[in-house]
Amino acid sequence: MSKIKICGLRSPDDIRYANELKPDYIGFVFARGRTRYVSISEAALLRSLLSPAIPAVGVFVNEPLEQVAELLKKGVIQMAQLHGNEDAAYTEALKEMTGAPILKAFTVRSKDDLKAAFSYPCDYPLLDNGKGTGKVFDWSLLGKSAPKPYFLAGGLTVENAPDACRRFAPYAVDVSSGVETDGRKDYTKMKAFIQAVRSLDSNE
């Protein structure tokens, strides 16, 4: 069964929803200028409200290595998701400094993009359509099996995520806008998304 990450949490209500619905991961966006941006102090407060059983993933775009490492070491986040131009040396250094799992986002337009994603020295490639377009990429590029576990993102909803899990068996599906109403996390949509993905295991 694919795991579930709900990204872009930014309020105590969001955390309350997560604590009740128990996704496998949640995400805090530290990239300035993004709609769902949270400051370090805000994230620390939200992490303190979040169930210890749910790992928090920090989303970064070209942040100084030391800052990302500090957030991991302090326990504000348990995993790092890199969305900028971070090279292999950056990722390897972060891994060596913290031992934490690392995700690296890749925009998928071709088989070559997939090859680059799966050869990059991260724990999990995150396959996406780009900068929060809310649309899926061409899933026909994917196969049933992959060289390493990956997170599938971009345009996922309660309607299409179960199909993606059934067809491609990603390690995890990553959703943000697909569980929102008017730019805010929607409890009903979060619950429906999680139930739809997890029901696959009981139906098969």
Regions found by a protein language model. Give the residues of each.
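Conserved N-terminal beta1-alpha1 strand-loop-helix module at the mouth
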Residues: M1-L127, K131-E204
